Amino acid sequence: MERYAFRYRYDVTSTVYTFTDKPATVTHTHTASGKDSRTEAYTYSYDHADRLSKVEHTLGGAKVTLAAYAYDNLGRLQSKSLHGSDADRQAYAYNVRGWLTGISGTKFTQNLYYNTGNGPAKYNGSISSMTWKAGTASTVRGYKSTYDGLDRLLNATYGETAGISTNANRFSENVTGYDKNGNIKGLQRYGQTGASAYGLLDNLTFTLNGNQLSRVEDAVSTAAYGTNTAFVNGASAAGEYAYDVNGNLTKDLNKGITDIQYNLSLIHISEPTRP
């Protein structure tokens, strides 16, 4: 089965589908007045279980592999290779319950712990602790997590090395409480405050009207350092945030925005316009 879609400027897109209605080949032909046409194609391959196994791109007669996927006997993603190179391969590991426990590759490595690791043991699928390392970096970074009685995140305690104990709290985050609707009432964020100094960047208190945020106050005036970001407490008023009847944000005094107007786009999504 083949379908065609025509667009302005003489672009033609054709799609060939498999018998299970998945795209097998998507071909784009680009034409313009006075120019030679250009055709590119994406080819999708599937394994015996109809799972995506390879994505290839063809342009000017040259075909390259964009991605290749392999699955284990339980149908879980086992590995992913990008750009036809094992150098960009990532492997995935799971525990007996099917929960993801690790991602390993040359560009990024991550380990997730539930009832093992350095955080309080969790047996319901919530992450107790996690560690990661980017590329060839020697530093292993991680977080230990704690939860309240309703299994809502309370603390994400930062640390380095496999034990998540070195340089503790440099980038920790703490939720100070929840309201009866499950909205957070306060948030503390730590980060870099100087060339070699770390400390509390934000100590935020949230005021809500129902489930809509109406005010944010920050008890810390310390500015973030370098590329770190901290909340900018640009106002101190009862109604720092306002909304229209559809729930769209119409005012954000902390960013100096006093009025946001919306129109209705062709795809029925409200788009903000600055007056």
Question: Locations of the language-model features?
Answer:
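Acidic/glycine-rich beta-solenoid
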Residues: M1-S270, R274
